[in-house]
Amino acid sequence: MSEEVGIILREAVPGDAKDILLMMGQVNKETEFLVLDEAELLLPPETLEEELDYIYESNNNLLLLAIYEGTIIGTASVKADSQFRLSHVGEVGISILQEYWGMGLGTLMLEEIISWAKEMGILFRLELDVQVRNERAVHLYRKMGFQIEAVMPRGARTDLGEFLDVYKMSYLIE
């Protein structure tokens, strides 16, 4: 995809905070597949800048941006704990603007995350939670080697309060 439409993948830096917040606000309007609360969406850019600085300097955290024509159209993150006993586990999250769904961007970003994790040699488990009804995402994760470990009944809710089942999925790095 990157050759076809000129997508740039790069790590986020503190100066990206405002654009990331705009993009995440748009994604939150477009889909109920993500679980974002008001606090995350109303985060002051300065606070996110500090968080982005920490992530950028960290060896076991990553925020990858997909940029097209100067606009952030997707993010892929890996968040790991600083505590030694959990520092080998990275929680994966991917968000893509709806206009760019189905174009291979999720695959591209997930390949980059897995490659980064293997190269860093610090993370030995990637994990994520995904709504069972998000078939497109489940297909992507399975295609990339993630395994379903559990079904969490009532693991999430819709805006109308309907309970949703959620998969716990993982990818083990040898």
Predicted regions and their residues:
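Conserved GNAT acetyl-CoA-binding A-motif
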Residues: 110, 117-129
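A short beta-loop-alpha structural element at the N-terminal edge
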Residues: 8-22, 172
